[in-house]
Amino acid sequence: GILDTFIPKEWAEANGTTPDAVDGYLALQTLNKVFEYNCTGSKVYDNCWDFVAEDTHALFMDIDSEVVGKNFLYMLTEDKYAAMLKDAFNALPADEQAYFQPTIDEMESEANDLGLGADGKYALAWIKLWVGSYNAQTDDGPICNTLVSDSATDQCGLLVYSKLRSVEESAGVSVNNIKVAAYQDGYKGIGGYGYCHYLFVTDNSPLPWTACAFIAYMTCTEDGFSAWGKDMGGYSANPEVAAAIEETYQHSKGGYNEAGEDQFPCKDDRGYDWWTTD
């Protein structure tokens, strides 16, 4: 191919391995897209099936606009995530289960034909309902701007978490007009998804060692990663850099004001480990 993978020695060591033993590509960072909902009304989204419920149209970057959105849906068919969807379904009240059950039953033969696991029908049902109901948008920025408005009562979306960093508080706009669904006590099911940014060296690079040095700078030093790390929702794939970034920027208390009060709780970034563990 035209892209080569370079694994910096320090990056590999920080991850408890060696460059030769790394199987895959060099990740710069993981970003996450999370379910959020406007909380100016009385509607609560406490289960991932709520985002595909009747008459719900979540704001979402169209799957033909960004490949990671399509990949997210494919990932849901993996046994681990299909089981999470099944468990979330089982936690629903009976009347809500009754709405989804026909679609789940309809997808059983499809799941078998595709060779999916025992819970594959739950994944396919969620995917079908999502694709058939979401409100397609061109970018996550406008989605965020819509949801934080006090006129977006009960609306919801799946969008890049870090977009909350740029919300400017005003009379009709506030970060406190939304909630991050997975941060709420008792939430069931998937809270969103993560995706990586990878770094490569091109085969035709006139200065490949310079490219490698720059890659090492971005992935192995706090200063090099700070272009992304200064903002919430971007997690370095180097655990040493990630720890240094948190020490400097304190994203876990991103919603705190100068008086030490938690003014915007949804901006308290819980971090990579929280998002990637059950």
Regions found by a protein language model. Name each.
Residues 1-142:
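Extracytoplasmic ligand-binding site segments that recognize negatively charged/polar headgroups
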Residues 122-124, 132-204:
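Extracytoplasmic/periplasmic substrate-binding proteins
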Residues 1, 52, 270-278:
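Short, intrinsically disordered, charge-balanced linker/junction segments flanking boundaries
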Residues 33, 40-43, 64-69, 161-165, ...:
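Solvent-exposed loop/turn segments at secondary-structure junctions
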Residues 48, 143-146, 211, 224:
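Short, hydrophobic alpha-helical packing/hinge segments within bilobed ligand-binding/sensory domains
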Residues 2, 56-57, 77-81, 132, ...:
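Sec-exported extracytoplasmic/periplasmic mature domains
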Residues 197-275:
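Mature extracytoplasmic/periplasmic domains
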Residues 29-31, 72, 194-197, 210:
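Residues that flank catalytic or metal-binding motifs in active/ligand-binding sites
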